[in-house]
Amino acid sequence: RTYNAETRELAVEVKGRAIEKDAYITAIVTQSGIVARQSGATGEYVHNNAPRAFLTAPKGDKLELDAEGNYTVTYTYTIPATVGSFECLPENMDVAVLVHGNISDPESRLVYNADQVSVVPEVSSAAMRAMSLYTNDIDVDIFNVELKPVCEQICR
C-alpha cells in the first residue's frame, strides 16, 4: 500500500494465487482510537477497528483468475477529513484484507486468509514491509501505484 499525506490518497494492490475457483476478496479501511459514547457504557469509550470504508463490495468482489489461478486487484481511496462528526486520522487506520468464499452461499462461507496493514507506515519508507497472506497457494503482496513492490518480502 501507499499513502500520500498531501492528497490523503491510499492505494492498495493485492496479488496472489487462489486455490479455490470461486474466491472473493473484501478490503476494509478501519480506524482505532475513536473516543466516543457507547450505549451501555458510562463516560467515554475507546472504539477500535471501526469500519470507515469498504474498498470492495461489503460481501466481497469475485476474483478474476487467470489460467493458473493468479489474480491482481488494485483499490484506491481518498480518506476524508471526517466521517460524520468524527475526524479520520490516517495514522490510526488500517486496511484489512480477507480472501474468502461466496458469503451468499452457506456452504462456501470460509475465510481462506486475512491480514491487515497500517495506512501510515510505522517505519521509514525504505524499511516499509509488504503485506503477504499465505494459506495453501494464496498470497497477497502490496505494491505502490507504479506496480513496484513496497519491499522485498514479508517480515511478519
What are these regions (language model features)?
Residues 1-127:
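Short, conserved sequence motifs used for protein processing/export or organelle targeting and
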Residues 20-24, 150-155:
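Solvent-exposed loop/turn segments flanking beta-strands in beta-repeat/beta-sandwich domains
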Residues 129-152:
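Surface-exposed, proline-anchored Ser/Thr-rich loop/turn motifs
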Residues 117, 123, 147-149, 153-154:
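Intrinsic disorder/low-complexity segments enriched in polar/small residues
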